[in-house]
A protein has these predicted regions:
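N-terminal export signals
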Residues: 1-8
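Signature of N-terminal electron-transfer/Fe-S-associated modules in redox systems
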Residues: 2, 23-188
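Ala/Thr-enriched low-complexity intrinsically disordered regions
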Residues: 4, 13-18
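Generic alpha-helix initiation/capping and coil-helix boundary signal
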Residues: 8-9, 133
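Cationic, low-complexity basic patches in intrinsically disordered or flexible, solvent-exposed regions
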Residues: 11, 22
């Protein structure tokens, strides 16, 4: 089963209330030109300010690693790093991401080498259907940036907002611990 979400182009024609400050005719929402820094590159994007960052990443930039799960910020499938911290891109308006570095799952790999968290997830087999994996990895990277030697309780607490319906949490926890060790050994 695939979850559908409105395309960002469909959002441009969403109806606004009659008493809106923006007074647009025919119920259109005005798009605005914004510059995003994603995975170290700058992109001009033209969307309504309240368009979820997830839609812009997927529809405009073609970065489909971040997944649409619930659209309510409850599952973590859409997690990206904004300013180094994990955030739910389905809940972040594109205007709030302007001027801040955004990193998606596609931006973790460097020079053909996986990030230690990505490698640890592969080594531990920390996925089944893999729908949640990019969000789990991005949240784990955020954790390890702030806590390079987390306990099992720290990992469980930090990832409690990421849902894995396949039940691979024990392997995910093992992967985060392995990644922490690799990162310490590499001096990251």
């Amino acid at each position: 089963m695939f979850l559908a979400y409105p395309s960002s182009r469909e959002l441009v024609t969403l109806a606004t209330s009659a008493d809106s400050e923006q007074n647009f005719s025919d119920g259109e929402v005005m798009a605005m030109l914004t510059e995003l820094e994603v995975n170290g590159k700058r992109y001009p994007v033209n969307y309504p300010a309240d368009t979820p960052l997830l839609y812009v990443l997927r529809d405009e930039l073609g970065l489909t690693g971040s997944k649409y799960g619930c659209g309510e910020g409850q599952c973590g499938a859409c997690a990206v790093l904004i300013g180094g911290a994990p955030r739910r891109s389905c809940q972040i308006p594109v205007s709030a991401a302007a001027g801040k570095p955004v990193v998606t799952i596609e931006g973790l790999e460097k020079d053909g080498r996986l990030h230690p968290v990505q490698q640890a997830f592969l080594d531990a087999g920390a996925f089944q259907c893999a729908y949640c994996t990019s969000g789990m990895i991005m949240s784990s990277v955020g954790l390890l940036q702030t806590n390079p030697n987390p306990s099992q309780a720290d990992i469980v607490q930090f990832l409690q907002g990421n849902v894995c319906r396949c039940g691979t949490h024990p392997r995910i926890i093992d992967a985060v611990r392995q990644a922490a060790k690799m990162m310490r050994e590499q001096g990251r």
